[in-house]
A protein has these predicted regions:
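Glycine-/small-residue-enriched capping loops at alpha/beta junctions
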Residues: 1-175
Length: 175
């Protein structure tokens, strides 16, 4: 499994070669924020319309696969409902990560980009979100290439962890 960072800016997304975009949002998160909000804007409000019409709610366990249209550089868009934001904690974060990784694996997504659950609303810090993501990833055999979407300050915090991981791997290879 490879992990790298992707800016939460549309210009950065336009540089992406392929893969899928995985979006997460809470049932009480309106308007959509972070990556989901940017994708909604790029899709001319399609996600907001789906929510308004009752076809998408953000309920826990909800998932929806959409074509990306011409305005997103991804092969597909997969949306995950996280349920209510109240009570969100690390245990719930971990369960969402396991579920998202399982669905991505079953869908045979070899490459995908996502903003970790709770990052858009600030319910989990960037550094901790990546630490827990890597911890969950270490416990399974899935090998997808993952681009973690975050803002500049979040990327800065996450980059430290990725550099440390890389140094650990290099040291292990030399030993």
């Amino acid at each position: 499994m490879g992990v790298h960072l992707l800016g939460n800016e549309l210009s950065r997304w336009d540089e992406v070669d392929s893969g899928s975009l995985l979006l997460t949002f809470f049932s009480d998160e309106r308007p959509l924020r972070g990556a989901a909000g940017l994708a909604d804007w790029r899709l001319c409000g399609r996600l907001s319309r789906l929510i308004k019409r009752g076809h998408l709610s953000g309920a826990v366990g909800e998932k929806l696969l959409l074509p990306p249209g011409r305005r997103l550089p991804f092969r597909s868009v997969l949306i995950f409902g996280l349920g209510p934001s109240q009570g969100f904690n690390e245990e719930i974060y971990r369960s969402h990560v396991r579920w998202i990784r399982e669905v991505a694996d079953k869908a045979r997504l070899g490459t995908y980009a996502l903003q970790p659950p709770g990052r858009a609303t600030g319910l989990i810090g960037a550094r901790r979100a990546l630490e827990l993501w890597l911890d969950e990833a270490a416990q399974d055999s899935r090998t997808a290439e993952v681009a973690i979407i975050d803002n500049q300050s979040g990327q800065k915090d996450m980059a430290e962890i990725l550099r440390y991981q890389q140094k650990k791997r290099q040291a292990a290879e030399r030993a």
